[in-house]
């Protein structure tokens, strides 16, 4: 918290007119276990324009002193809570991925809830450890209290939303937890995932139910009023920005093949823009999501290929 206050004071010194807006500043959070070099490179880039809370295990503690706008919080502060342990006891894995991997994805939201409560924050912008921010999130004009990516294309039981770039408040967490309980504990809403469970099981198709399924259901069932960050968003000056779903996939707001694509990745234009080939519009880029095998591209040299 001391590092955050220092960061805020620095902003005032650099730009006194920002003082009235300090309380509206949106902090970022990453939850990760086990050191990976790409996480270090992410923090170096993302923390240039954003204050980042890093919730992780002992292997990540050194990163909190390496970057001035990064504050490390030991994950044990949240992971060992009685409530989290109780929720884990109710979890059943309906996915071809491992139990531990899928549970941790769910647990992130439970931990964010407790983090917001303990640190008395109104909201936080969650980013995955392989998702780099190129802009100051606080400069964006969010239209709703909660905002994340929900692909327009939901065919073949995709049922997917993503908070790899997600504005989250306590209400989001509480409604996610309630939906989790209705599906996994009292099973009053198990029917919402039953067809998808059967689809993957009977057709022997990899994947299944995950935290992303519940993000999708929160929106589809109108449990939560959300802004879909799959679509363009403006900053305070009126410039249009867009969030990337996956660096290795050209899917965007206008379909599966929206963005200009070269070889195996979305084309980055002028170091921080992308081009929608369907709408024929160029957008400022909010993020780059190095999902899956693309993580190897987030290396010590990548920062020289972009502007942030």
What are these regions (language model features)?
Residues 37-40, 106-110, 209-217:
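A structural signal for well-ordered alpha-helical segments within the folded catalytic domains
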